[in-house]
Design a protein with these regions (language model features):
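Non-heme di-metal
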Residues: 1-190
Length: 190
């Protein structure tokens, strides 16, 4: 089995995770959550997008001088995309509430919650410098994110929110492909 086939098999093996995630999103929105629950839910997503932006920007800043220029470009685009996603989700929250969001207070409140996710999980399991773990995480986590954002866009009746989330879902697919390309390259390396 070559690296492309191997990486494709990883995606196929994670299809149940992707489907379960879509089912959770659908069940959540079918439950008709209150405005407060929606806002809290989206604040978590907004903060996660900001955390991704910071972590990926740090990754770009610390790339070796001889790093592949295309990889630098792709990761830089991802950092930019995460900043856009942060703004889009902030705008969604303000659209729902009709009020400006106190971003600093929202981030502080979310940071006080004990849930470890994203980059914090990589640090917890001492994988934040492991190229293979990072590529695998990016491939699978961003692939899952693509499916989740698209499912939210499908479930949400408000077109302002749906269009914002469809854009985010599209970008997450690109981010997953960055991980896929890196993983294929690493799996070809001795």
């Amino acid at each position: 089995m070559n690296s492309v086939d191997f990486v494709n098999s990883l995606k196929a093996a994670n299809e149940p995770l992707f489907l379960a995630s879509e089912m959770q999103v659908e069940a959540y929105f079918d439950s008709k959550p209150s405005k407060d629950k929606l806002v809290n839910h989206f604040i978590g997503r907004m903060v996660n997008e900001r955390m991704n932006m910071v972590e990926i920007s740090n990754q770009v800043a610390n790339m070796p001088y001889d790093a592949d220029p295309i990889e630098i470009q792709n990761i830089s685009k991802q950092a930019f995309d995460e900043a856009v996603h942060f703004r889009l989700v902030k705008e969604v929250i303000e659209h729902i509430t009709g009020e400006p969001l106190d971003v600093e207070a929202a981030i502080e409140a979310e940071a006080a919650k004990p849930t470890a996710k994203g980059a914090a999980l990589l640090e917890k399991y001492e994988a934040s410098t492991d190229e293979l773990a990072l590529a695998l995480y990016q491939f699978i986590a961003e692939g899952r994110a693509e499916r989740v954002w698209h499912k939210m866009a499908d479930c949400i009746e408000d077109q302002f929110i749906a269009n914002s989330y469809r854009k985010i879902g599209h970008d997450e697919g690109f981010h997953s492909n960055i991980g896929k390309m890196k993983l294929e390259k690493l799996c070809d390396s001795p």
